[in-house]
Regions:
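Conserved alpha/beta-hydrolase
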Residues: 68-88
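Catalytic nucleophile-loop/oxyanion-hole region of alpha/beta-hydrolase
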Residues: 84-118, 420-428
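Primarily recognizes the serine-hydrolase "nucleophile elbow" in alpha/beta-hydrolase
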Residues: 110, 116-190, 347
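Alpha/beta-hydrolase
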Residues: 200-363
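Catalytic active-site module of serine/aspartate enzymes centered on a nucleophile-bearing elbow/loop
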Residues: 404-406, 410-442
Length: 442
């Protein structure tokens, strides 16, 4: 009875959230999967599906993610999951999340008629799914590389492989996004009020514009990116030293301890609180534009090939949130920081040693062979990162396109529009393209 009650609650939640598409998923089923949670979405009509799609993030609630309804109404069985660490960044042990993906893959494989499994990695779901598949294809040697800041256990041996992956506005790795959001002007981790004014991104002398797009000089950008890496490396060194003290029994706590990063960005990983230059200056081509002509899916569904720049608007208001506790301060444990949020680098732009972290889409895709689709959102911040990840991917069957005018959650960027409705079809275009790509292969 409790399961039925929760099913009814979820059905109501999904109907309210996505009423325009609810006819295709009128009876989602809650599925407990050990420490993970899941909701199964099936088409109400049409041919019996043979493709199952797994949707999950490392900590976000994806039980009613837009992909659940959009894919199921297009004829797929979709399992939308929450990991064992849902809504709890402090508790994350990154490598364990692959066990939750495994449970989802195995569950879908047991469903009648399902012969193919596709992983859907949106945002932080991208490193989640790519890590899983890299270990599934290569074994635990991939995640036990001594280069990693943390390694996996042998319980990840024998993960069942998926047949393909769709990456949608993928994080290149969560540690990389954390790194680029750091405010590197902090001089003392115990006193965030002490700053190096020459590195302050919110100082007009350095190019900050409180009323619109900022304009940082190439010289400032270079120093800033290097200083972001220097700060990350210092915090890593502190955490590693503390981990060793705990191992030796020389610390009060023998298992774990707190890591607080002031002016480091939103503690729940969402928008706000960051000191990312590309958020303040969206015209930053090194991050916000493709390096060469790529496919752009226009609002009318047509496709053109051109150099693509994000149409994102600046967010100068991050000055206030970056200085706050609730939105601008990261709160981790030593374990969650090192496994889920840390990466070595010499500069945050192009000097990142991606494979020092197991939480890295960029690292994982270099060891994955199944077909991969990369879709970047044209009004978000991951256009160049997605292109770079696509270029490095080992798969011989891969595709890359940008959805014009789409925000990170796939919805239209209304403030970016020059005319009302200019980007009205972002959701349809994304899921139509992904559906055609999946059906053509599986």
């Amino acid at each position: 009875m409790k399961v039925l009650g929760f099913r009814a609650f979820l059905a109501g939640l999904c109907l309210a959230a996505v009423s325009a598409t609810a006819q295709a998923q009128s009876n989602p089923l809650y599925v407990p999967l050990g420490p993970a949670k899941a909701v199964l979405y099936k088409p109400d009509s049409g041919p019996a599906p043979h493709i199952g799609i797994v949707v999950m993030h490392r900590v976000a609630n994806y039980l009613s993610h837009i992909a659940c309804t959009e894919f199921s109404k297009r004829g797929f069985v979709v399992l939308c999951m929450n990991s064992r660490f849902d809504n709890n960044e402090v508790r994350v042990v990154w490598e364990q999340i692959a066990l939750d993906v495994k449970a989802g893959v195995e569950y879908l494989k047991r469903q009648p008629g399902i012969t193919k499994i596709v992983l859907f990695g949106h945002s932080g779901g991208a490193p989640t799914m790519s890590f899983y598949q890299a270990v599934a294809e290569n074994g635990v040697a991939f995640c036990q590389d001594p280069k990693r800041l943390t390694t996996c256990d042998n319980n990840l041996a024998g993960l069942p492989k998926a047949d393909g992956i769709v990456f949608a506005d993928a994080h290149p790795g969560f540690p990389m996004t954390i790194l680029r959001g750091f405010n590197p002007s902090i001089l003392d981790e115990n006193d965030p009020g002490k700053v190096d004014a020459s590195l302050d991104p919110f100082d007009p002398k350095n190019g900050y514009n409180p009323k619109g797009a900022s304009n940082y000089s190439p010289e400032f950008q270079k120093r800033y990116f290097e200083a972001q890496s220097a700060r990350m490396n210092r915090i890593i060194d502190r955490a590693l030293a503390l981990r060793e003290k705990m191992k030796r029994g020389e610390h009060y706590y023998k298992d774990n301890d707190i890591v607080i990063i002031s002016r480091g960005g939103n503690p729940v990983g969402g928008p706000g609180g960051v000191a990312s230059l590309h958020v303040l200056q969206p015209s930053l081509e090194s991050i916000m534009s493709t390096a060469r002509p790529q496919k752009l899916i226009k609002n009318d569904g047509s496709i053109v090939t051109e150099v693509i720049s994000s149409v994102a608007v600046p967010d100068p208001g991050t000055r206030e949130t970056n200085m706050s506790f609730d939105v601008g301060t990261k709160v981790y444990s030593v374990v969650s920081f090192l496994s889920n949020n840390a990466v070595r680098s010499t500069n945050s732009l192009d000097g990142i040693d991606h494979c020092t972290s197991n939480n890295s889409t960029v690292c994982a895709v270099q060891s994955i062979t199944v077909p991969e689709l990369y879709l970047a959102m044209g009004a978000a911040n991951f256009i160049r990162d997605t292109e770079m990840t696509f270029d490095l991917a080992k798969s011989s069957d891969k595709d890359f396109a940008v959805i014009e005018g789409a925000l990170h959650p796939f919805t239209p960027c209304r403030p970016c529009e020059k005319t009302p409705g200019q980007y009205s079809n972002t959701v349809k275009n994304l899921f139509d393209y992904a559906t055609n790509w999946i059906n053509a292969r599986f």
